[in-house]
């Protein structure tokens, strides 16, 4: 099971020939759901300023035309389900229009239909809705066709727009009728200014049209108008809206010539043939053609033959190993094909599309010399991917002609369209990678790649060789971890142009992980003259984790940090909870940069930001040493030695001193997730420590005094903020001792937030002078009181209130935060503890009996319609005054029905089809009764307790309902795909 996240909206620079190189950025005009602030439904009868039409007759003509056209225009709400080729997985809106009412054919853009899986529906002018499925997307040009069932539209007569490409003329007044900027209907006016511009270039690693003229006009269309008809005053479609400038009112329309041919093929049930010689032409003006070697005779002939043309086609990019490779060179001017003089892209397309498998004769001029070459025309569809593979959480397909053309490379290779999961090779670049080999086996094509992946066992580490399209000179080599348990699917998807669905087959079941063998490792002492310090390298290791599921709203990432061995005989290691936030992940320990072995999670502290893991001591043969742990808390002014790991995993050391020990409050994230609370952090005067994300503080005799840990904080500017602080080892000692005794520890806590306040503040709040004197007499480190900063919502209400000043617990004066850590016990202890609190509230001393609670880690999640649902985790209880439901959304996929229909992270689902869903089990029972591709009503509650309702359409083919549940006794996670089979699969064992 894997989850992807992506975003489609982009602004790109145009650099195509014939335009100003400093031209403003361009964008395609599809509209992303996340960018909709408010959608207003605009009535077809739009008030119009008559003066803008020149006269009343023109106004009435346009008014009548628009009234007819809007009956053909539809708003398309769609999801491109999987990352494919140049397109991310995305939910968006666009426009289309009916071109055949009887067959139910809608014309829109290719970048709307997309090259990969598509799910969508169309909304007609009268707000009737029907599903649409792709029946054709052009391999190169920016158009595609969707099909709908005309019988589903009951309350209006469907009208088709007639395509008239010949009516597009310079100076013609036009209207763009569509879903502009997410509006239900917008009508934009303009005039055609050019018919012969080259296709706009939207930049690299994205879809670009080429080998066609584009029409230019000024209509100021924006996001959502993609696929809109460009109509004249007679109501004919003369072009198709495709893109435009983000900084000017310039729009780009696709001519309808090749679209009309494709439509006729569909109407007559004939294949839409598309030929290619794998060459990109650009239209260049005659003066530039002359500079490239066009002779005067040929120029005169062309000007006479095509008096309305301003230039000829010139070879721009010739793909290596293609039919025209070597025969045609960049800068060659095209004269004729098969004896026909050529002046436009339309002529070239017409010849190539009818000549697949045949040889054509091409005359070009190069440096004033005429050359005749012969090329065999290939099938453009054959070099356009129509299948992809999902394995190890990533997606792969053959390199497309679209991508190969942009970079001038052969159309071959395995393209990673989503570098995630095991193939998360660069967190900043998810697309554009080519797999050269894996497990030391070359992968020249997708079939070979599939066969190689079949042979690799689960949990194996293999070598990956790869490069990026933007830098073909640099070959990267790395080792990757094959995950076939969390990301268990190995599926081959293939496009079905009859149904519009991408059918899939399961390629292979995971091969069981190989049995691990023990290895020896040699430690290098720390280069220091103090033997007790030098050998501490034998007690340190690197801990790395691999996560695949955004449990508890925590990031899906691979984290590496250092750990400290606390018991070498039993294999216990203490590590930051930043690396081990939950147990729905894989943990590995590396000793001496030599031996890596798996580890299991045995303890997660609910508030102190540390975890304890365990490794098999029989798998590593090395001199691992259990260090001495201090029993004395650190104090301000203590001298100590910092030992830490830099970002490149190098050990560094420095003498330092403790500058402060104070209570720290880590800011909460806007989406609640685990953070350390009620901390007293140790600050040190050491520049080296700021360069290390993990380490220890030690005495000169090697006694461990504190852990240097990384703490996950809030998310800002799309980045997680990480705090670096020291945690006194005595705060962990009680738990460590229980583990050494062979007992399983657990911690019950006072579920409230605390912070330090000064004596002055305490006096103002009403703390009596006698208690202030007690504090002054007994406090050794800092004169402070502890106050309640917040109280969590719990099943049994906490009697503390925000603002309470804590005087004593169990009759002992509270001077430090550590006195409120809660109670450490063993797993055998069923009952939580009750503590006697004495507090000052509103100037009065009161006594309270406060019951501690055990924090439950998440042990069940469900994936429904692309959303991750689970019981509210502890951070949610900490952040809210009440919990509306036990079904909490912690994440939603960027191409999912959850996003499309309005489920957001931090929403609670309270009802499904008016059935209350108080917990996840009830929710799953209700969902199992809902058929595929049907709407269900959901009532939800926002994080701020605002109720709302949505209707959501299920899609179990691409978004099945899956449950992951942990057996608390065995520690095994079980995956169950509810919509497909009742077969249960164990995917991880602790």
UniProtKB/Swiss-Prot annotation:
CDD domains: cpPDZ1_ScNma111-like, cpPDZ3_ScNma111-like, PDZ2-4_Nma111p-like
Region (Serine protease): 73-263
Signal peptide positions on this chain: none
Active site: 111, 142, 225
PDZ domain location: 290-368, 758-843
Region of interest (Disordered), ranges: 1-32
Coiled-coil region(s): none
Top-level division of the source organism's lineage: Eukaryota
EC number: 3.4.21.-
A GO term for molecular function: serine-type endopeptidase activity
Pfam family, one: Trypsin_2
Keywords in alphabetical order: Apoptosis, Hydrolase, Nucleus, Protease, Repeat, Serine protease
One GO cellular component term: nucleus
Gene3D superfamilies tied to this protein: 2.30.42.10, 2.40.10.120, Trypsin-like serine proteases
GO biological process: apoptotic process; cellular response to heat; lipid metabolic process; stress-induced homeostatically regulated protein degradation pathway
Cell location: Nucleus
Role noted for this protein: Nuclear serine protease which mediates apoptosis.
Family of the protein in this entry: Belongs to the peptidase S1C family.
Protein name, entry field: Pro-apoptotic serine protease NMA111
Species of the source: Vanderwaltozyma polyspora (strain ATCC 22028 / DSM 70294 / BCRC 21397 / CBS 2163 / NBRC 10782 / NRRL Y-8283 / UCD 57-17) (Kluyveromyces polysporus)
Annotated gene: NMA111
């Amino acid at each position: 099971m894997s989850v992807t996240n992506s975003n489609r909206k982009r602004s790109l620079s145009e650099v195509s020939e014939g335009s100003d190189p400093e031209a403003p950025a361009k964008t395609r005009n599809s509209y992303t759901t996340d960018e909709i602030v408010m959608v207003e439904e605009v009535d077809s009868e739009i008030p119009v300023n008559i003066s803008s039409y020149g006269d009343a007759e023109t106004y009435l003509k346009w008014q009548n035309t628009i009234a007819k056209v809007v009956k053909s225009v539809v708003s398309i709400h769609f999801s491109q389900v999987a990352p494919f080729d140049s397109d991310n997985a995305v939910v968006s809106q666009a426009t289309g229009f009916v071109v055949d009412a009887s067959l139910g054919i809608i014309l829109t853009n290719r970048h709307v239909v997309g090259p990969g899986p598509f799910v969508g529906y169309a909304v007609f002018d009268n707000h009737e809705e029907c599903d649409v499925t792709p029946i054709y997307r052009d391999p190169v040009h920016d158009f595609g066709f969707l099909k709908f069932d005309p019988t589903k539209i009951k309350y209006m007569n469907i009208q088709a727009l007639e395509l008239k490409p010949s009516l597009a003329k310079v100076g013609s007044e036009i209207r763009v009728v569509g879903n502009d900027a997410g509006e239900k209907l917008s009508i934009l006016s303009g005039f055609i200014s050019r018919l012969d511009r080259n296709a706009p270039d939207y930049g690299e690693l994205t879809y670009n049209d080429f080998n066609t003229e584009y029409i230019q006009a000024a209509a100021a269309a924006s996001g959502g108008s993609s696929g809109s008809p460009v109509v004249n005053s007679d109501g004919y479609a003369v072009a198709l809206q495709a893109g435009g400038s983000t900084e000017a009112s310039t729009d780009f329309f696709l001519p309808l010539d090749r679209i009309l041919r494709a439509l006729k093929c569909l109407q007559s049930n004939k294949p839409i043939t598309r030929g290619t010689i794998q060459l990109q032409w650009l239209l260049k003006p005659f003066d530039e053609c002359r500079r490239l070697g066009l002779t005067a005779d040929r120029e005169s002939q062309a000007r006479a033959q095509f008096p309305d043309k301003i230039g000829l086609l010139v070879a721009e990019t010739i793909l290596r190993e293609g039919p025209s490779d070597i025969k045609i060179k960049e800068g060659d001017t095209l004269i004729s094909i098969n004896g026909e003089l050529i002046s436009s892209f339309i002529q070239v397309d017409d010849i190539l599309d009818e000549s697949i498998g045949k040889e054509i004769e091409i005359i070009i001029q190069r440096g004033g010399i005429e050359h005749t070459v012969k090329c065999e025309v290939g099938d453009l569809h054959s070099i356009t991917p129509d299948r992809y593979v999902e394995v190890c959480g990533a997606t792969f397909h053959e390199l497309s002609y679209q991508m190969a053309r942009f970079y001038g490379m052969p159309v071959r290779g395995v393209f990673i369209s989503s570098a995630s999961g095991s193939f998360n090779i660069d967190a900043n670049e998810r697309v554009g990678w080519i797999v050269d080999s894996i497990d030391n086996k070359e992968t020249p094509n997708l079939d070979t790649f599939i066969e190689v992946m079949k042979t690799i066992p689960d949990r194996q580490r293999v070598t990956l060789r790869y490069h990026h399209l933007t830098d073909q000179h640099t070959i990267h080599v790395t080792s990757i971890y094959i995950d076939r348990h969390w990301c268990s699917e190995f599926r081959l998807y293939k496009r079905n142009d009859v149904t519009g669905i991408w059918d899939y087959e399961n390629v292979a079941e995971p091969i069981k992980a190989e049995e691990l063998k023990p290895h020896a490792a040699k430690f290098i002492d720390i280069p220091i003259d103090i033997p007790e310090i030098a050998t501490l390298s034998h007690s340190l290791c690197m801990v790395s984790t691999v996560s695949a599921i955004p449990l508890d709203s925590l990031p899906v990432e691979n984290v590496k940090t250092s750990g400290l061995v606390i018991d070498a005989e039993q294999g216990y290691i203490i590590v930051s909870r930043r690396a081990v936030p939950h147990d729905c992940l894989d943990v590995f320990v590396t000793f001496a940069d030599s031996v890596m072995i798996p580890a299991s999670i045995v303890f997660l502290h609910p508030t102190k930001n540390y975890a304890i893991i365990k490794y098999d001591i029989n798998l590593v043969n090395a001199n691992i040493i259990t260090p001495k742990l201090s029993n004395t808390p650190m104090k301000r002014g203590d001298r100590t030695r910092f030992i830490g790991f830099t970002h490149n995993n190098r050990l560094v050391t420095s003498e330092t001193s403790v500058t402060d020990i104070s209570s720290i409050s880590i800011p909460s994230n806007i989406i609640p997730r685990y953070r350390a609370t009620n901390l007293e952090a140790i600050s040190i005067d050491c520049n080296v420590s700021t360069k290390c994300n993990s380490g220890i503080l030690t005495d000169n005799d090697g006694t461990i005094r504190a852990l240097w840990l990384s703490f996950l904080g809030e998310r800002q500017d799309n980045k997680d903020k990480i705090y670096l602080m020291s945690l006194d080892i005595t705060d962990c000692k009680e738990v460590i001792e229980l583990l050494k005794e062979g007992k399983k520890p657990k911690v019950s806590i006072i579920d409230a937030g605390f912070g330090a306040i000064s004596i002055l503040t305490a006096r103002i709040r009403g703390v009596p002078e006698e208690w202030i004197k007690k504090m002054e007499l007994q406090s050794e480190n800092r004169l402070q009181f502890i106050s309640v900063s917040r109280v969590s919502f719990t099943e049994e209400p906490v009697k503390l209130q925000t603002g309470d000043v804590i005087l004593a617990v169990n009759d002992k004066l509270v001077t430090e935060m550590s006195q409120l850590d809660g109670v450490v016990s063993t797993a055998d202890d069923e009952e939580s503890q009750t503590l006697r609190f004495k507090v000052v509230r509103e100037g009065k001393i009161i006594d309270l009996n406060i019951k501690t609670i055990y924090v439950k880690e998440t042990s069940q999640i469900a994936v429904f319609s692309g959303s991750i649902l689970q019981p509210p985790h502890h951070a949610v209880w900490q952040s809210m005054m009440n919990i509306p439901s036990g079904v909490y959304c912690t994440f939603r996929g960027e191409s999912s029905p959850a996003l499309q229909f309005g489920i957001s992270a931090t929403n609670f689902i309270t009802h499904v089809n008016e059935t209350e869903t108080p917990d996840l089990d009830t929710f799953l029972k209700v969902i199992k009764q809902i058929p595929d591709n049907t709407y269900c009503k959901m009532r939800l509650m926002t994080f701020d307790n605002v109720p709302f309702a949505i209707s959501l359409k299920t899609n179990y083919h691409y978004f099945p309902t899956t449950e992951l549940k942990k057996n608390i006794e065995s520690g095994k996670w079980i995956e169950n795909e509810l919509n497909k089979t009742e077969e249960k699969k164990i995917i991880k064992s602790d």
